[in-house]
Each structure stands twice: as structure tokens, then as C-alpha cells.
């Protein structure tokens, strides 16, 4: 059984244990994609989507009302940065916001301890990815993305990955056909609005699962969910001192299978306290293990 691993701090793990719901669920914070650690991450995903749009339009022989032309038209009088700012602001206003939780396929990775594991003083939590469910009858406000009965957990695709084109084709081809139908129904003066709407939807479908190839070593998986009408958006200050938005995502506590204690943590005493708490909350068969990474702090 393959697991996915979430690197975090001991204080976050303590908070998860202290706030287990009456339904025996952890309450995780899924952060807005626009609030991720790398502020350019979403824009990178957008650029990959834009390249796909241009390639698709050439292959399909689409000559008029190209969705990708919104970029070239806007750049005639504005900078790339101005367009990016306008585009993200529009997505914010229309609440087209993917919320994500990052995991990895690697349970004990030196660079991941450094980047996400509090410089080796955190933990890596191993979860089964099945049974991550939301209610089927939940809705999304003003957005043509339908939720399935499961929260989406997918491998992140790194640019130039051999299966990236397949992912984009599956995710975006139907959306482009919907755009053409809407574009043909509207007058020219309304085309920009239609383009912005569909470009936004295409981007939020694909961008949560695309990262720069420099991050391929993370072997990341992402749990992504799109804001529903009844989801309450909350706010907090992250470890970098930035204000971010998030929504709460329940994950059954039974999905927790392992806890790897970071290489710079006192393993014996931490393991003892964790075992007491796991017994208190009636966890079954959670393996607590010590990192094997020879980690040096600076």
C-alpha cells in the first residue's frame, strides 16, 4: 500500500491531534493556490496552459476567436506583470480558487526536511489517499467545474514530463469546446469577458497540478478542492509572516499510517509522548519511526 507524506511541524501535528472532530477526522488547512510557498507557482501553471492553448489551436486549425489571443491583445498596451495581476484579481473576485494540501511520495527526504520539515525539526505524516471524501451534493458557485464524490489527489506534473500533454488534453479539450460555443453566441464586444471566464476555468483546472521541473525532486502529490458555496474561507499568518486564505478539509484519522520523526528531533522522548497521545485518541497501527537522514543544521 503506497502512502503519501505531509511534512509539517510538531506544533501543527499537536494541533491536529488536539482538534480531532467528533467524526474522528483531522481538520487540515487547504491553502489558496495563490498563497502557496512559491508565489510564481500559479503563474507558471498558467503559462503552461497558455502554451497548450496555442498548440491546440494550431492543431485544430482554429483561426478566429482564439482563446489564447487574449494574451497577445492585452500585451499590446500592458506589461506581462499587469496582465498577471489583472487575471489573478479576476479569479479572486469570482471565487475561482483552488485550495490545495501538498504531499510527497517520499517519506524521508533531506531537501523536504529542509524546505517543509522545519529544518529537520518536524515530522512526516504518512496517509492512505483513499477515503478522502466530500459530500456528493455540494456545489460550486458560478463555476463550470463539477465535483466528484472524492477530493482530487493527483501527482503533480513537472514541465516536460512525458504525460503532461495527456493531462492537459484530458483536462482542457472539453473546456475549449465549451468556450467556442460561448464565443460564437456573443457579440465581439463581449468576447473579452468570455475569454477571461474560460481562460480562468482552464487555468484553475490544470494549474494546481503543474510545477517547474526544478522541483521534480519533491515527487509531489496534491489534494485539491475548489471552493463550494458553503465553504467558509478563513485567514491566518503563515510561517513566513504572510496573510493567507484557506478552507478546512476533514481527513479521517484512520488514514494516518505512519509518523516519521525528523532527524533533528529527540526521537526517544518525542516517540514516547506521541504514543501516549495516539493511545488516548484510539489510533490503531500507526508506525512511529526515526528519520534515517544524516542531517546537519546550519
What are these model-predicted stretches?
Residues 1-298:
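Partner-binding and oligomerization surfaces adjacent to conserved cores of proteins
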Amino acid at each position: 500500500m503506497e502512502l503519501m507524506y505531509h511534512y509539517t511541524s510538531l506544533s501543527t501535528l499537536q494541533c491536529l491531534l488536539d482538534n480531532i472532530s467528533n467524526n474522528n477526522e483531522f481538520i487540515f488547512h487547504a491553502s489558496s493556490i495563490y498563497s502557496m510557498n512559491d508565489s510564481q507557482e500559479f503563474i507558471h501553471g498558467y503559462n503552461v496552459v497558455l502554451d497548450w492553448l496555442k498548440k491546440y489551436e494550431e492543431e485544430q486549425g482554429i483561426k478566429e476567436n482564439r482563446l489564447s489571443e487574449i494574451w497577445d491583445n492585452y500585451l499590446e498596451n500592458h506589461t506581462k506583470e499587469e496582465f498577471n495581476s489583472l487575471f489573478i484579481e479576476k479569479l479572486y473576485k469570482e471565487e475561482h480558487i483552488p485550495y490545495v494540501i501538498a504531499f510527497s511520495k517520499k517519506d524521508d527526504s533531506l531537501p523536504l526536511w529542509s524546505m517543509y520539515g522545519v529544518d529537520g525539526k518536524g515530522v512526516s505524516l504518512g496517509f492512505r489517499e483513499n477515503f478522502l471524501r466530500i459530500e456528493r451534493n455540494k456545489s460550486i458557485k458560478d463555476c463550470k467545474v463539477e465535483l466528484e464524490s472524492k477530493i482530487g489527489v493527483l501527482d503533480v506534473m513537472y514541465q516536460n514530463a512525458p504525460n503532461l500533454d495527456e493531462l492537459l488534453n484530458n483536462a482542457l479539450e472539453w473546456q475549449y469546446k465549451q468556450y467556442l460555443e460561448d464565443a460564437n453566441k456573443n457579440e465581439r464586444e463581449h468576447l473579452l469577458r468570455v475569454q477571461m471566464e474560460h481562460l480562468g476555468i482552464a487555468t484553475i483546472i490544470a494549474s494546481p497540478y503543474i510545477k517547474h521541473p526544478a522541483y521534480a525532486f519533491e515527487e509531489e502529490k496534491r489534494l485539491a478542492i475548489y471552493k463550494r458555496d458553503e465553504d467558509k474561507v478563513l485567514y491566518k499568518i503563515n510561517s513566513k509572516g504572510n496573510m493567507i486564505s484557506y478552507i478546512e478539509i476533514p481527513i479521517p484519522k484512520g488514514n494516518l499510517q505512519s509518523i516519521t520523526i525528523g532527524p533533528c528531533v529527540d526521537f526517544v522522548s518525542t516517540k514516547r509522548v506521541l504514543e501516549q497521545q495516539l493511545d488516548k485518541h484510539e489510533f490503531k497501527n500507526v508506525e512511529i519511526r526515526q528519520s534515517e537522514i544524516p542531517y546537519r543544521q546550519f
